[in-house]
């Protein structure tokens, strides 16, 4: 196996987003570790953990893009997942022990009519094996220690839940568009119960997070292969040009206010500026100022004045 090429001579000042297609079997932090070793960035993080048994979209933020992580994490997510009927597990996926079984196998005709009950703002009890905190401790830590975990139902937003396919009598494939805090494993569990059977997730893939979708996905192997093919002296800049999206991609849904070069300089010093122009917004809770299409700062607008809260160094 070829040794993985790395650029370790110095920490690289990289700013932007890499939309990684996380492979099945890796934790999100393991995938992030591989990206760190390839790019050697000064600062890096990810926006939204994926379970090891899930694959798909893992947004990776470099440098100044880490300041925009909350806008990505608060955005909508789309998941495609397979539910296997007839067994419920204590983890609500294939990793756990079977705790209930059923001979009932729902069909497309019985599944479709109940899906609307799971759309909108609904109450959901998270899986016992989840990162939800109970008295300051993670639920999965308590569950692994054999302690009885009782989690309260909490509101979640499901914008769309579609039946995609029924490959055979034992399985059904769904696609869900949902908000922050939704557990797809719990959705599968509750679907099974509502249909008079048991169910657990056997495949899970994330297709969208906030502004990033399938068209943005980059496979880890593609990055590794490109790194190996670089000519001597090309370094990490060639990888950044090939795979890293601009910081502003994460702020597509925010109000953008273009400012002059002089005002941009003031904003970078933390000063508020009066916005000019007939179309300038008067009041906005969250917006970002830009100059020459480059983000300057995130902030708020009150009575026509932009007040920065987080300044970009781009």
Regions found by a protein language model. Give the residues of each.
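Accessory RNA 3′-end/elbow-binding domains used by RNA modification enzymes
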Residues: 1-23, 29-46, 50, 54, ...
């Amino acid at each position: 196996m070829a040794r993985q090429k790395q650029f370790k001579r110095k920490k690289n000042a990289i700013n932007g987003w890499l939309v990684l297609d996380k492979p099945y079997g890796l934790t999100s932090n393991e995938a992030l570790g591989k990206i760190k070793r390839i790019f050697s960035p000064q600062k890096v993080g990810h926006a939204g953990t994926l379970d090891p048994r899930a694959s798909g979209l893992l947004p990776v933020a470099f440098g100044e893009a880490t300041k925009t992580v909350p806008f990505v994490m608060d955005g909508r997510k789309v998941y495609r997942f397979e539910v296997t009927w007839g067994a419920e597990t204590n983890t609500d996926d294939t990793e756990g022990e079977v705790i209930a079984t059923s001979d009932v196998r729902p069909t497309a005709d019985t599944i479709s009519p109940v899906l609307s009950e799971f759309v909108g703002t609904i109450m959901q009890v998270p899986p016992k094996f989840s990162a939800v905190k109970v008295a300051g401790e993670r639920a999965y830590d308590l569950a692994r220690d054999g302690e009885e975990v009782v989690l309260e139902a909490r509101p979640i937003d499901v914008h769309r839940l579609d039946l995609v396919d029924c490959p055979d009598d034992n399985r059904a494939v769904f696609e869900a568009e949902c908000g922050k805090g939704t557990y797809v494993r719990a959705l599968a569990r509750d679907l099974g119960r509502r249909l008079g059977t048991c169910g657990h997730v056997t495949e899970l893939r994330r297709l969208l997070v906030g502004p990033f979708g399938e068209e943005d996905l980059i496979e880890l192997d593609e990055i590794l292969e490109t790194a190996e093919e670089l000519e001597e002296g090309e370094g990490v800049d060639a990888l950044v040009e090939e795979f890293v999206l601009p910081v502003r991609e994460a702020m597509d849904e925010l109000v953008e206010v273009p400012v002059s070069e002089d005002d941009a300089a003031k904003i970078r010093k933390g000063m508020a500026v009066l916005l000019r122009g007939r179309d300038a917004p008067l009041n906005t809770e969250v917006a970002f100022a830009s100059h020459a299409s480059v983000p300057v700062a995130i902030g708020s607008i009150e009575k026509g004045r932009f007040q920065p809260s987080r300044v970009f160094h781009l």
